[in-house]
């Protein structure tokens, strides 16, 4: 009987243990859960997920990993993944800072300082991983030809610790970014509320103006056309009257100019006649005097010629 009870007790305990262990096995590991969140998150989280996957592969310390560690290929790949992660993280942080502009300056400075510290811790963790692998490569090269089992064991232990620290700091950074994003969203909502308060009166004025325009649009088309026609007719009459007045002014100005020109021409003609008479009074006495002198000279010449042609008396008679 005791044996039967002991068998039943063992069976019961085994069943309880199976029930207890079953949900534990079904729960995903924290690292796997975190990796799933990274793969479906922001660009910086995706880049960090690639770094995490590569680090898990390095931690296997397979023959291929050890070969690439000795050739510095692993450290180069980790450096590339680190730079990519930090670049995406800085870009995401800059976007959030732009969205935080409506938030108070003190709150924005505090959040930025906390986020900067978390970002620095994550970068230091990744740098520690890379430095530890560089150190391992140097140690292996120094022990060329000797057993490196102890070095691999120490490296595996260090990598496990670094992975836990990296996971913790990445989770902390994720939470701080979530707070940062919530603050940005709250600031954006405040900014929208302020814009609505400023634009509310303008929108109301626009609504009233639209209603006024709508009431004007409801008038009969014929009345509006007549009103426009009367305005246009009055405008044309005003323009025509101004044009006629301007033409009259131009005509008067042309007549004045013509009268002045005729007067000036008459004055010039009189001045020319007076000048001509003056010239004539100057030169007529000179001409008459020259004519008299010329006539006297001709008479003298003729007299001299006549005297020279008379016959000379002869002494023989």
From Swiss-Prot:
GO MF annotation terms: cholesterol transfer activity; heparan sulfate proteoglycan binding; heparin binding; identical protein binding; low-density lipoprotein particle receptor binding; phosphatidylcholine-sterol O-acyltransferase activator activity; phospholipid binding
Residue spans of the Sequence repeats: 80-101, 102-123, 124-145, 146-167, 168-189, 190-211, 212-233, 234-255
UniProt cross-references to Pfam families, sorted A to Z: Apolipoprotein (PF01442)
InterPro entries: ApoA_E, Apolipoprotein_A1/A4/E
Example GO biological process: triglyceride-rich lipoprotein particle clearance
Superkingdom field: Eukaryota
Phosphoserine sites (modified residues): 147
Record has rRNA-binding as a keyword: no
Positions of region (Specificity for association with VLDL): 278-290
Signal peptide feature range: 1-18
Protein's cellular compartments: Secreted; Secreted, Extracellular space; Secreted, Extracellular space, Extracellular matrix; Extracellular vesicle
Residue numbers bearing the Methionine sulfoxide modification: 143
Assigned GO CC terms: chylomicron; extracellular exosome; extracellular matrix; extracellular space; high-density lipoprotein particle; intermediate-density lipoprotein particle; low-density lipoprotein particle; multivesicular body, internal vesicle
Sequence segments annotated as region (8 X 22 AA approximate tandem repeats): 80-255
Record note on modification: APOE exists as multiple glycosylated and sialylated glycoforms within cells and in plasma. The extent of glycosylation and sialylation are tissue and context specific. Glycated in plasma VLDL.
Stored SUPFAM superfamilies: Apolipoprotein A-I (SSF58113)
Region LDL and other lipoprotein receptors binding, residue ranges: 158-168
Function: APOE is an apolipoprotein, a protein associating with lipid particles, that mainly functions in lipoprotein-mediated lipid transport between organs via the plasma and interstitial fluids. APOE is a core component of plasma lipoproteins and is involved in their production, conversion and clearance. Apolipoproteins are amphipathic molecules that interact both with lipids of the lipoprotein particle core and the aqueous environment of the plasma.
Family: Belongs to the apolipoprotein A1/A4/E family.
Name of this protein: Apolipoprotein E
Organism: Colobus guereza (Mantled guereza)
